[in-house]
Each structure stands twice: as structure tokens, then as C-alpha cells.
Amino acid sequence: ICALCIQSILAQEKMFVHRSDKITQGVLLSVLDSMTFVNEAVLLHLHDQDAPTYSMTEIDSLSFGDNSLQIKILYSDTGIEIVNPLAFEGVSISVDDGNVIITSTISEEVEYILTGTISNGMFKIYSDKKFILTLNGVNITNADGPAINIQSGKKVTVNLTEGTINTLTDGKKYADSGSEDMKGCFFSEGQLIFNGEGALYVQGNKKHGICSDDYLLVNSGNITITGAASDGIHANDYIRIDGGSVTVTSDSDGLDGDEGYIEINGGKV
């Protein structure tokens, strides 16, 4: 048995475990007592937490760096790369084929940055708190569900990174989700606020293009609904456009505020 004490690494805040499955997990050095190597396994001993265990074949390397509230997800048909510095602080991420599924109980506002291209996948999240979703040149197609599926009633700020083109496409039929609501290619149970100077193209083959079960606000960005089987943009409470550009092609309403209203104060529609 060999114990490695890392408390002397005072200049850094976290140790990052780079796993062979392309997932990187961060551990706060302040809660890490030691690492133990035993029987071809690595045990991380944390204050007041169960010790996570990795087999030696699971770990590619270790590195040290600063703390961060940014989680990075790079989509690819050959494997999804994830950097999760909050793995032991309340943000759990699993990958099922091309589907990234996040459960977040952390109290801080986390930013999820999506890049890359996948031909059959999804971004799905359950979050107890509001968060930021940055689309940084991501292209997601999902054959049997939404491309983005936010099962959280909290506010989501969607940043469209300047100079990027982001494309979302859903399937004509969705897999059974039990009691979960899914009403569009980009779906959220909570409020959606769009910012940034990038472009977003959405193809809603099942129902709506973009749908919020709360309100939807566009401050900036170039949003194009290339097609929707129902409404282009749908919100239960209201839709407000203060800036940016919104272009819609749909089989039903272009914009539908459902139980609320539609307010256009600026931008181009």
C-alpha cells in the first residue's frame, strides 16, 4: 500500500482525474486527504464523503488546476469528452450512447458549454438551480427525442457564442419518457433567456421548434426555426423579443404565447 499526500500542492485548487472514457472529474484539494493505491485500484479519501474508487486502467492521467463552475461537453460520434470540475460537489454526469444526462444539486450557477457534432444524441439536465447553457458551435441530432431536454423549472440563460453556428434537430417520434414532458426540439420546463451574437438553427420534427413551459425572452442572437410540425416558438406564459433576429417556418403558429402574450420591443422578426 502506498499513500500519496497532496496537501503540499497549495498553489492549485483541484486535482483532475482524466479517465480513459474521455470524462475528466475534478476534486477539491481542500477535501482530499490522500490517494491510496491498492490491488490495482486507486482510492480517493475525501473529508465526510465516500471514497471514489478507480481501477488503474480507468485513469489516463492526473493534473492540477484552478476551480471552475464551467462544465465542458464536446460531442462526437466517436466519443463524448466531458470536463466536470464539480463531479464531487453535486453535479453528476452520465453518458448513454450519445445522450449526456446531468443531475445537478449544486447551489451555484453552473455554466455548461456545448461544442462538437453528434448524429444521434441529446443534452438532458435536471437542475435544482438556475444555470447557463452556452452553445459554442454545437450540432445535435436526436432520432427519438429532443436535442436539448431541460427537465428543470429553473431559469436557463442560453448564450449563443459570437461567430458560431449551432444546429438542433429532433426526431419525428420520441421514445417513451414516462411522465416527463417533452414538447419540442429545444425544450425546457423553465424560463429560457437567449443572449449572444451567434446563430441557432432549430428543426422541430415532432412538435414545436423551441418550447418553454414558462416564459421565453430573446435579448440577442440570430434564431432560425427552419421547420416545425407545430409552433415555431412556443411558451406557456409569454414570449418577449427585445433584440436579435428571429425567423420562423412552421406548420402552425410562428410564435405562440399560449396562456400569456407576445411582446416585441426590438430586434427583427
Predicted regions and their residues:
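Sec-dependent N-terminal signal peptides
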Residues: 1-5
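Sec/Tat signal peptide C-region and signal peptidase I cleavage site
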Residues: 6-11
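Compositionally biased alpha-helical segments
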Residues: 12-68
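A composition-driven surface/loop motif
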Residues: 67-269
